[in-house]
Amino acid sequence: DKSRSRGLGDVYKRQACVVDPSEAEPIINYLKNKDINLKYILNTHHHFDHIGGNEDLKKEFGSIVVGFKKDSERIPGIDIFLEDDQIWEADNFKAKIIHVPGHTTGHICFNFFQEKLAFTGDTLFSLGCGRIFEGTYEQMYESLNKIKSLPKETKIYCGHEYTLSNSKFCIKNDPDNQNLQKKIKQIKK
C-alpha cells in the first residue's frame, strides 16, 4: 500500500503530531532516533490504514488522539473530539477542522492555515479523489469545493500516493491532453 503518514514538529519543545498513522513501528523508530515526543495523533477518518498505529503510538508516547466527534466510536483511543469549522489549538499546533464527507461520512481535513498546510486524508489525491464508501457523490463534490476554496498557496498533503495510477486513468479519458502528458512524464522521472 502507498499510505502516507505525515508529521509536524515543534522544534523548540521537541514535540510532534502525526496525521493518519497507518502503523506505529516506523514512526516510533524515527521519533526515538530524533529524540522527539509524539504529543498528538490526528486522524482524518476511521479507515484502518489511517488509524492502525493509534493504540501502539499512544501506548509508547502517551500521545493524545484527535479526531472527528461524529466518528469517535470508530477511532481507537480518541481523546479529543472535534467539530466542523472548529479551530483546534494545542501547544504550538493550530488547525481549522473542515468536515469533508464523501469517502466516509466522518471524514475531516486538518487545515494548518498559518503554515498553509492541509491534510486531506482520502478526500483529495494528486489527479483524483477518494472512493465513495459511505457518503454521496454530492457530498464529495461539496467537500472538494471546500478544499478548492483554500488559499492557492496552501500545500495539500493527501493520504496515499496514487499519482501514477490516477494519471493512467486520466489519460485514457483525455488522450490528447498535452498538460496531462507532460505531467505523466514528470511523474515517471
Predicted features along the sequence, with ranges:
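Single conserved hydrophobic/aromatic residue that forms the stacking wall/gate
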Residues: 1-12
